[in-house]
Amino acid sequence: VYKRQMCDSTNAERKGFTMSERTVGRTFDNIFAEHRNTRIIIATFASNVDRVQQIINSAYKYGRKVAVEGRSMVNVIGTAAELGYLKIPDKTLIDIDQLKNYPDEKVVLITTGSQGESMAALSRMAASIHKKVTIKPNDTIIFSSNPIPGNEKAVSKVINELSMKGAKVIFQDVHVSGHACQEEIKLIYSLVKPKYAIPVHGEYRHLKANAGIAKMLGIPKENIFILKSGNVLELSDKEAK
């Protein structure tokens, strides 16, 4: 049976290796130290449990309570804590309704909406239609994510709306991609040694960059398949077509 490899293409245009998640933890620590007197709101992917853990670690270190907003964020954090994947110190987590009982400099809000989704919590805060959180001048708002290709305009809109409310928005050096860069893509192709390469997950230019790496590593052009949505690829023990 020939090996067929479907490989993530999102960062196929980026040289080098993806940086360690630990670098974000150091950045959080610096931001918390520099913004001791403001409320901190952090938007990130609900699925990134390790990122949430690093936020909680910094919050605990600097004496802040942590509230969570956004259905997916609440669900993931609850499940991760229950299963032991997330370590939350006692009395650190508070309900969002309790935010008003603490000074701004003593709280952190972890929220959904890092991609500018119109109905996500942060977008509703930016548009002044969130029922429980009102953006205040001098709030420090961190986008711990990069815009997924195609979401740049929506994210920029939310950042502008937050800035117009007087908030300080930080979006540089507070995210490490969860996707492989070129050297990791080369590594996985070298380890698996597939006969057929099927670049996936990305726009066409990302798939094409991935295909270029596969070809460079010796996979014949006719064995590399760049597929569009709706294309059918037939795979058998002997061939792919």
Can you say where each PLM-predicted feature lies in the sequence?
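Hard-cation-handling environments
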Residues: 14-144, 148-241
